[in-house]
Amino acid sequence: MEDFVRQCFNPMIVELAEKAMKEYGENLKIETNKFAAICTHLEVCFMYSDFHFINEQGESIIVELDDPNALLKHRFEIIEGRDRTMAWTVVNSICNTTGAEKPKFLPDLYDYKENRFIEIGVTRREVHIYYLEKANKIKSEKTHIHIFSFTGEEMATKADYTLDEESRARIKTRLFTIRQEMASRGLWDSFVSPREAKKQLKKDLKSQEQCAGSLTKVSRRTSPALRILEPMWMDSNRTATLRASFLKCPKK
């Protein structure tokens, strides 16, 4: 699973996930499913904010990243992916500026158009079950909840999906692709089932032992986007390029 994550996701997302797990004292070598889940959640949060800006009239517009109008205000503030101290600093700043009620738990995004915090969920189960779990945990009508599944289903507070249909379709397509890629490698069942995950962990550890000593150093590029958490969209060409840059365990 760890190899899959490093091949499938943008290196910046992988690095953020590694930092998050380290902050909470979690071992990504052991909790590989959580590693994959965090990377998936991060990417969905970035895609959610992708290309969405607010113009001078306060209207929400969609602009490509290479458009000169990209200097307009981002519609969404990304909170997910920051260390806890910085994340709460951002939340406090938003609350002081907008008058929004401070949430009890760290949300994932803030929507400057609708003036509300957003909690993003990505689930391998039924969307309505996960939605209820989120709602019971947050216990606040002020925080908007939006849940996506790997099967293309979604659920949001008061059926308000925030984004246009095309933007949501990109997220659903990406999640479905991740599921298909996992399935093709025999990883999906272990990603869904804890029992299967234990079996897969044993296979992963055995595979790592076989690969020990065969890896060479891979250069890491640090993008400015990592520091400012700019949104990104992993198109097929970019994914193919990233995959080519990573090493695989040599076939014997």
UniProtKB/Swiss-Prot annotation:
Q: What is known of its domains?
A: The probable endonuclease active site in the N-terminus and the basic amino acid cluster in the C-terminus are important for the shutoff activity. The C-terminus acts as a nuclear localization signal. The C-terminus is recruited to host protein complexes involved in nuclear Pol II RNA processing.
Query: Example GO biological process term?
Result: viral RNA genome replication
Stretches that traverse the bilayer:
none
Q: What is the lineage of its organism?
A: Viruses, Riboviria, Orthornavirae, Negarnaviricota, Polyploviricotina
Q: What does this protein do?
A: Plays a major role in the shutoff of the host protein expression by cleaving mRNAs probably via an endonuclease activity. This host shutoff allows the virus to escape from the host antiviral response. Hijacks host RNA splicing machinery to selectively target host RNAs containing introns for destruction. This may explain the preferential degradation of RNAs that have undergone co- or post-transcriptional processing.
Superkingdom of the source species: Viruses
Q: Name one GO molecular function term.
A: RNA binding
Matching entries from InterPro entries are given as: PA/PA-X, PA/PA-X_sf
Protein name in UniProt: Protein PA-X
